[in-house]
């Protein structure tokens, strides 16, 4: 049989198995010969040969027979050159506006981008293998302000970025919104790309991981999905808490995680809580995440906030060189806005733009005028002590009973309500909340939180109690 005949067979197979199955399983096959009623083919991996034998072997034999090339069985031999003749997509030499996950073809050469805002260092080139998410050119180590709350996370991130050799596997960064987790993730990718231009770095959010997996299932193309994720040098997944409770996605993530660890590949993951605090996260995943280095990025302190503002002011000052600041403005903002870095930087950006429009010097009074809503929103901080106090007053019980081992419903239900409010209105972890409630285990706190959530759906009085207490605490 000639190669022309095999090409005709391939076209018939395409019509039968569909484009996705054809691309994943038939296209990588190279015809060799038919010898003693055995059709010989070359394949790039044993896995492909085994899969095609089990799923398409009989179909291939029927199509061969239909084209006058009779054979009784198929035999696959692994060859590194198999599939090399398959044409790459025409657009692989140009940067893609929306990178695709299924990027098995050679990646484009680095493309240099200029940061939209002035920065002390030039924006790095986009890494060659980032099919999941585009990196922010401003999220580099040079633009990351280090202070006591984040110095350990910064040091760990720098260590991982120094080499392709596995350092901490995985490195797990966690903390509240706007504290710098994503910034450090991007910075690691930029630094690794700078040191190792040929490295395959896959950075994406957990939500993107889930959507790509669901699409692969829908299109019956899980092979390419697995190949994409398991052929990388570094896998970086942001906001892993998103897949908690999503059984199939968690199972695939678990297998991907294990495969990369076994191959000695570096994994970096971020989340909004410690693995032990993630409700509905598969215990196997939580256990794996805790096997590496788990680093908490703490809420900002005054010194760090002031440093962030000073750095941001330098960048914005290049864009608005005519704007002047009165003494004490940055210190005032650092003192008043303590929620997170994102809010802090957004407030300063707004202040610069406002001062530019009204052509006035930036003073504390101007800041109060411009940032009324931001300052009001950050004025009130709910603490666990306040929650215990207000909940005890509302239900008319003693605080000593609240943290006791008393299991009577008249005490247990208010206790669970207070646990629920602590979880919803503060950034405290489950173990921290448990410590506040007489040293209870984090699983007890989680049970209490879920119990109130369940009761709120069925009991309007419980829902009303929770809402009234929330309003009282946030007033």
UniProtKB/Swiss-Prot annotation:
It is found in: Cytoplasm. Residues 107-129 are annotated as: Disordered. GO terms for biological process: DNA replication initiation; regulation of DNA replication. InterPro entries: AAA+_ATPase (IPR003593), Chromosome_initiator_DnaA (IPR001957), Chromosome_initiator_DnaA-like (IPR020591), Chromosome_initiator_DnaA_CS (IPR018312), DnaA_C (IPR013159), DnaA_dom (IPR013317), DnaA_N_dom (IPR024633), DnaA_N_sf (IPR038454). One of its GO terms (cellular component) is cytoplasm. SMART domains: AAA, Bac_DnaA_C. ATP binds at residues 178, 180-182. Residues 356-475 are annotated as: Domain IV, binds dsDNA. Keywords: ATP-binding, Cytoplasm, DNA replication, DNA-binding, Lipid-binding, Nucleotide-binding. PANTHER family: CHROMOSOMAL REPLICATION INITIATOR PROTEIN DNAA. Plays an essential role in the initiation and regulation of chromosomal replication. ATP-DnaA binds to the origin of replication (oriC) to initiate formation of the DNA replication initiation complex once per cell cycle. Binds the DnaA box (a 9 base pair repeat at the origin) and separates the double-stranded (ds)DNA. Forms a right-handed helical filament on oriC DNA; dsDNA binds to the exterior of the filament while single-stranded (ss)DNA is stabiized in the filament's interior. Domain I is involved in oligomerization and binding regulators, domain II is flexibile and of varying length in different bacteria, domain III forms the AAA+ region, while domain IV binds dsDNA. Belongs to the DnaA family. This is Chromosomal replication initiator protein DnaA. It comes from Jannaschia sp. (strain CCS1). The gene is dnaA.
């Amino acid at each position: 049989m000639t190669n022309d005949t095999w090409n005709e067979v391939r076209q018939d197979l395409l019509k039968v198995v569909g484009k996705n199955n054809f691309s994943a399983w038939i296209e990588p096959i190279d015809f060799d010969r038919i010898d003693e009623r055995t059709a010989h083919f070359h394949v790039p991996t044993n896995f492909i040969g085994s899969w095609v034998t089990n799923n398409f072997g009989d179909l291939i034999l029927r199509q061969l027979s239909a084209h006058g090339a009779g054979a009784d069985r198929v035999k696959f031999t692994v060859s590194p050159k198999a599939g090399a003749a398959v044409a790459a997509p025409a657009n692989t030499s140009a940067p893609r506006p929306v990178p695709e996950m299924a990027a098995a073809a050679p990646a484009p050469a680095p493309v240099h981008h200029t940061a939209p805002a002035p920065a002390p260092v030039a924006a790095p080139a986009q890494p060659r293998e980032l099919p999941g998410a585009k990196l922010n050119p401003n999220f580099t180590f040079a633009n990351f302000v280090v202070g006591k709350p984040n110095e350990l996370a910064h040091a760990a991130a720098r260590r991982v970025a120094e080499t392709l050799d596995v350092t901490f596997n995985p490195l797990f960064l966690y903390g509240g919104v706007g504290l710098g987790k994503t910034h450090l993730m991007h910075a690691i990718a930029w630094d690794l790309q700078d040191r190792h231009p040929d490295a395959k770095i896959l950075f994406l959010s957990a939500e993107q991981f889930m959507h790509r997996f669901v699409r692969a299932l829908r299109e019956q193309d899980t092979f390419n999905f697995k190949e994409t994720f398991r052929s990388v040098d570094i896998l970086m997944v942001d906001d892993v808490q998103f897949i908690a409770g999503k059984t199939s996605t968690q199972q695939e993530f678990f297998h991907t995680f294990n495969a990369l660890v076994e191959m000695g590949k570096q994994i970096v993951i971020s989340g909004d809580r410690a693995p032990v605090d993630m409700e509905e996260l598969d215990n196997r995943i939580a256990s794996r995440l805790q096997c590496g280095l788990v680093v908490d990025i703490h809420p900002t302190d005054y010194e760090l906030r002031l440093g962030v503002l000073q750095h941001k002011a330098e960048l914005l000052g290049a864009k608005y060189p005519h704007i002047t600041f009165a003494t004490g403005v940055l210190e005032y903002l650092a003192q008043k806005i303590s929620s997170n870095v994102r809010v802090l930087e957004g407030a300063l950006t707004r202040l610069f733009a406002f001062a530019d429009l009204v052509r006035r010097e930036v003073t504390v009074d101007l800041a109060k005028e411009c940032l009324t809503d931001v300052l009001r929103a950050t004025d009130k901080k709910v603490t666990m002590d306040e929650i215990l106090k207000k909940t005890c007053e509302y239900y008319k019980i003693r605080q000593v009973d609240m943290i006791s081992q008393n299991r009577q419903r008249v005490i247990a239900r208010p206790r669970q309500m207070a646990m629920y409010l602590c979880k919803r209105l503060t950034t405290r972890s489950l173990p921290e909340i448990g410590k506040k409630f007489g040293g209870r285990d984090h699983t007890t706190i989680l049970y209490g939180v879920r119990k109130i959530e369940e009761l709120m759906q069925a009991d309007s009085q419980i829902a009303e109690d929770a809402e009234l207490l929330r309003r009282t605490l946030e007033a």
